[in-house]
Amino acid sequence: MRVVHLSDLHYGPRHLEEADRCFSAAVDRAIELAVDVAVISGDATDHALDLHAPAALRLLAQVRRLADHCPVLMLQGTWSHEPPGTLSVFRMLGSRHRVFVADRICQVALMGSASPRDLSVTDAAAADLWLASEGPRFAEVPPGARAVFTCIPSINKAAVAAAVGATAAAEAQGEQLAQLLQGYAGIQGLARAAGVPTLAVSHGTVFGCVTEHGVPMAGFDHEFTTGALFSTGAQATLLGHIHRHQAWTQGEGERRQCIAYAGSIGRFHHGEQRDKGFLLWEFGPDGVDCRLEPTPARRTLDIVFEGRPDMDQLREAVRAQELAGVSVRVRWTVADEDRHEVDRGAIERALSGAADVQLEGRIVPMVRTRAPGISQFVSLADKVRAWATATDVHAPPLLECLERVTTTEPEDIVAEALAPQADEVSGSDA
């Protein structure tokens, strides 16, 4: 059995061209590979979309095209990206194969013995190939099941906090999910003994995973650990949420288990590392395996200056690169007093051949040192001594000037400042 695993499509106005180009290419490739079933593991949209919005129409068209080829399972992703109910419209597509929307914790079986590519367009059996459990899991493997999917949608952390308290929510979430996942081991074992492929689908963060920008995720509020996910007994765990493809495995042959993020379908931000694409999962007598199928994600280029942008270096970088179709980000770091010396217009003109240009300047604020306890001193001389100590300045000349300012009349100070110096007078006489 072949399963195509797509994730984090993020359809919305901001990323529409990138998302649609990459997802369309992925659907084309999935049809070419003759996959048996497709899984979208969350965040199909970037935020709530109006049904008449171009992003919604394009997403519906692509999912319909995919569902005309094979059954499709769509999982509820992050609530801020896919508010509850966002995916409900996909149940009504009327495609050749029904789209199953997993918006609750459940198990669902892919039914039927025939491969979708062997069914005729008029075959009624193709219209409804999904059987969902009434509760969180099946009591037994449904007869005729071709595969069993364990669906764990994105967790509403606010609900967890309301139940156990905000301070305990982070650890309680992980503990409750770990217990839930362990409870699936029994039914997964029965399915595997019957030769039925077992898959888990979820959306969240695995402790120790790495983001698309190369940052390890090692906090205490992450949903999963690899141990908890392996404890389900599923052969394959299809994950969404992290935009970088990565995988963990254990066991060999028929006992092999694999956990994998597909990563985002496209490159939505600057600095994202590695290829973008989707996963092709293959189940056979030798176990399960997956591989990344790349999509035509956009190319990005970062040009970084430690100080003010050097236009000569920038032009040299432009000559060394083919900028057509490339998204360029220029970053620099300058002191607060030099911020107005950066010519943004000149930078944009130098990069006019790029698909788009993003300018990011980091301003280093001026830091004024304040002597600790200076406000507690009564005399101005004591305050000057404290400041000189804090700033490592030689104090006696400052104190001499202070003495003159406080003990001499202003007219005398001005007259002395305007009077010619002794050496100047002697020089003129010579």
State the predicted function of each range:
Residues 1-4:
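Extreme N-terminal starter segment of soluble prokaryotic enzymes
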Residues 8, 23, 38, 43, ...:
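Divalent metal-coordination and catalytic microenvironments
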Residues 12-13, 46-49, 75-86, 108-111, ...:
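Active-site environment of divalent metal-dependent phosphoester hydrolases
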Residues 15-112, 131-137, 226, 230-234:
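Core catalytic region of metal-dependent phosphoesterases/phosphodiesterases
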Residues 91-98, 206-285:
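Conserved beta-sheet core of the metallophosphoesterase superfamily
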Residues 92-222, 262:
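Conserved catalytic scaffold of divalent metal-dependent phosphoesterases
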Residues 106-145, 257-329:
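Binuclear metal-dependent phosphoesterase catalytic core
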Residues 283-430:
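Accessory, non-catalytic peripheral segments of nucleic-acid enzymes
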